[in-house]
């Protein structure tokens, strides 16, 4: 009975040792096992009963308690380090020429050391298919756009191209001129209203008898187009031809008209006067005509003075040519620079010219030397 019990106990121990060895070796790669050469002759001390056991085969998990036999390992698995190695099927490594249905059924071999391995279905690797700009597939084709180009949907691009194609014939110089004139016509009324409000000024603080003096004074700043004087009051509304003249008139605010009157100038705020609907607005057309006549008379006076100067110069030249007066300017060589060309230089014959123009002949002064007195005494001089 005891022998039977010992056999059962030894069998249990052997099974436990087998399980422990299989568990300890499960998931351990061959490369990380302890080599036998580090333990010297311990391998020879192993009992023959253990080495002769049926577990000491090539399919066993281990052939020694200290060393693990090297099973046949494929060549593509020898370069995968780590405690757990995952090997993908070679069909996945190949170029993506197979269909997606074949790649979905490709198993993946997972090896955890030794012979314990299983296969599991894997998902297909995403294939990189290059799409051309025309919507088709371009396999192994060069890129058709730069990385900096803005990618837009095809519908948006076609819509934009259609819009530009339709709008291109309209962008002609004639249409541009028409649109610019329309824009100017729309802006002109608003600008005229703003200008009309800015060109009106109101002057106050004077006596009714000083209206003419006031108009003459403020006409110096610019052209007064019209004015409006109320029947009762000490103010007057005046309109200038431009905003700049009105601003200059407003700058005269608080000035002294005479010894007893201070005047003030502000911008006009009466809407009836600005719109031109107020009564008593007098247009100063007579002043405009007078100003035009004054400018014409000034122009005529300038022309007459210029013609008079030209006639004086002509007479002067004729007198100089007819007389025997020595002209230093005419005696010079024509190739040289004339004395008259010098700016600010007085000509040499200036005294002779002034004498001729004044009508007094030039008289030579007799020298006061001793020889000249002798000649005068003899009468030769």
UniProtKB/Swiss-Prot annotation:
Family: Belongs to the Nup35 family.
Protein name: Nucleoporin NUP35
Stored InterPro entries: Nucleotide-bd_a/b_plait_sf (IPR012677), RBD_domain_sf (IPR035979), RRM_NUP35_dom (IPR007846)
Ranges of biased composition (kind: Polar residues): 82-135
Pfam families in the cross-refs: RRM_Nup35
Primary subcellular site in the record, as a coarse category: nucleus
Domain RRM Nup35-type, chain residue ranges per copy: 195-275
Naturally occurring in which organism (per UniProt): Caenorhabditis elegans
CDD domains the UniProt entry points to: RRM_Nup53_like
Protein location: Nucleus, Nuclear pore complex; Nucleus membrane
Keywords, sorted A to Z: Cell cycle, Cell division, Membrane, Mitosis, mRNA transport, Nuclear pore complex, Nucleus, Protein transport, Translocation, Transport
Highest taxon above the source species: Eukaryota
One GO biological process term: mRNA transport
GO CC terms, sorted: nuclear envelope; nuclear membrane; nuclear pore; nuclear pore central transport channel; nuclear pore nuclear basket
GO molecular function, one term: nucleic acid binding
Region span, Disordered: 1-26, 77-149
Disrupted gene: phenotype observed: RNAi-mediated knockdown results in embryonic lethality. Reduces nuclear import and diameter of pronuclei prior to pseudocleavage regression. Embryos show an abnormal distribution of nuclear pore complexes and patchy nuclear envelope assembly. Also causes severe defects in mitosis due to abnormal chromosome organization on the mitotic spindle during anaphase. Two-cell embryos appear to lack nuclei and pronuclei.
Repressor recorded as keyword: no
The keyword Protein transport is annotated on this UniProt entry: yes
């Amino acid at each position: 009975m005891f022998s039977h019990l010992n056999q059962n106990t030894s069998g249990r121990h052997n099974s436990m040792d087998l399980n422990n060895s299989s568990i300890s070796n499960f998931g351990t790669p061959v490369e990380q096992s302890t080599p036998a050469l580090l333990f010297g002759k311990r391998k020879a001390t192993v009992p023959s009963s253990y080495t002769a056991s049926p577990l000491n085969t090539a399919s066993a998990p281990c052939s020694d308690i200290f060393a693990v036999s090297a099973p046949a390992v494929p060549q593509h698995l020898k370069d995968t380090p780590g405690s757990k190695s995952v090997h993908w099927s070679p069909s996945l490594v190949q170029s993506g020429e197979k269909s997606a249905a074949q790649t979905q059924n490709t198993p993946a071999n997972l090896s955890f050391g030794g012979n314990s391995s299983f296969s599991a279905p894997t998902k297909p690797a995403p294939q990189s298919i290059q799409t051309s700009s025309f919507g088709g597939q371009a396999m192994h084709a060069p890129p058709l756009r730069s990385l900096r180009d803005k990618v837009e949907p095809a519908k948006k691009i076609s819509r934009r191209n259609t819009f530009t194609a339709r709008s291109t014939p309209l962008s002609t110089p004639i249409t541009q001129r028409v649109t610019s004139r329309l824009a100017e016509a729309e802006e002109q009324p608003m600008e005229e209203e703003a200008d009309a409000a800015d060109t009106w000024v109101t002057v106050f603080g004077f006596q009714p008898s000083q209206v003419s003096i006031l108009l003459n004074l403020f006409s110096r700043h610019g052209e007064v187009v019209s004015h409006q004087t109320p029947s009762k009051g000490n103010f007057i509304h005046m309109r200038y031809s431009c905003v700049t003249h009105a601003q200059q008139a407003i700058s005269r605010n608080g000035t002294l008209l005479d010894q007893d009157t201070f005047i003030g100038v502000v911008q006009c705020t009466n809407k009836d006067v600005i719109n031109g609907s107020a009564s008593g607005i007098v247009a100063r057309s007579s002043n405009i005509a007078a100003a035009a006549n004054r400018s014409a008379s000034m122009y005529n006076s300038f022309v007459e003075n210029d013609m008079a100067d030209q006639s004086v110069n002509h007479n002067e030249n004729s007198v100089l040519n007819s007389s025997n007066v020595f002209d230093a300017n005419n005696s010079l060589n024509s190739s040289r620079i004339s004395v008259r060309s010098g700016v600010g230089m007085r000509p040499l014959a200036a005294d002779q010219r002034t004498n001729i123009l004044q009508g007094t002949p030039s008289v030579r002064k007799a020298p006061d030397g001793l020889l000249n007195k002798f000649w005068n005494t003899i009468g030769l001089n």
